[in-house]
C-alpha cells in the first residue's frame, strides 16, 4: 500500500493537483486504506515519521514472499515491492523511515510531495480497550 500510495501522490503532484484535495479524494475513493489515512498524512507533512524503517518493510515482505515460494506460489507484486525497497535501502540507508520510499519518485519527477496542515506524527489517542479472542467457526486450515 505504501508504494502504491506513493505513486498516486507523486502522480497527482506532477499533474498539478493540490495535495490536500488529493488526500481527501483518495480517502473518499475505493483506493482508501489504513496506510493512506495514516502514512499519507506524515508524507504530506514532510516528517515521514511513523517509527518504521525500510529494512523492517523488506524483512516483512521478504518473509511473506518466502512463505508463498515454499508452497510453490510465485507471486507477482511482492518481488517488485522487495526490489523497490532494496533500492530505497541502497539509496537512503536501511534505517531510513519507510514512508521515504516516496523519495525515489520525487527525485525522478523533480517534485516534493507536500501538503499543508497535516500532522508530523500519528498519535493514537483512543482509550485503551481490553482485547478479546477472535473465534472462527468452521475453520479449516490446510
Residue ranges and their predicted role:
Residues 90-142:
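NAD(P)-dependent dehydrogenase/reductase Rossmann-like domain
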Residues 1-108:
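Helical "substrate-binding/catalytic lid" subdomain
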Amino acid at each position: 500500500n505504501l508504494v502504491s500510495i506513493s505513486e498516486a501522490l507523486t502522480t497527482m503532484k506532477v499533474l498539478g493537483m493540490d495535495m490536500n484535495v488529493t488526500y481527501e479524494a483518495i480517502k473518499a475513493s475505493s483506493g482508501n486504506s489504513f496506510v493512506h489515512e495514516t502514512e499519507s498524512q506524515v508524507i504530506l507533512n514532510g516528517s515521514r515519521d511513523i517509527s518504521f524503517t525500510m529494512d523492517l518493510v523488506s524483512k516483512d515482505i521478504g518473509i511473506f514472499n518466502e512463505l508463498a515460494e515454499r508452497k510453490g506460489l510465485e507471486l507477482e507484486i511482492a518481488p517488485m515491492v522487495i526490489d523497490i525497497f532494496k533500492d530505497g535501502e541502497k539509496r537512503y540507508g536501511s534505517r531510513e523511515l519507510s514512508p521515504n520510499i516516496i523519495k525515489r519518485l520525487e527525485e525522478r519527477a523533480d517534485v516534493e510531495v507536500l501538503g499543508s496542515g497535516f500532522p508530523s506524527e500519528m498519535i493514537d489517542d483512543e482509550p485503551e480497550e481490553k482485547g478479546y479472542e477472535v473465534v472462527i467457526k468452521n475453520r479449516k486450515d490446510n
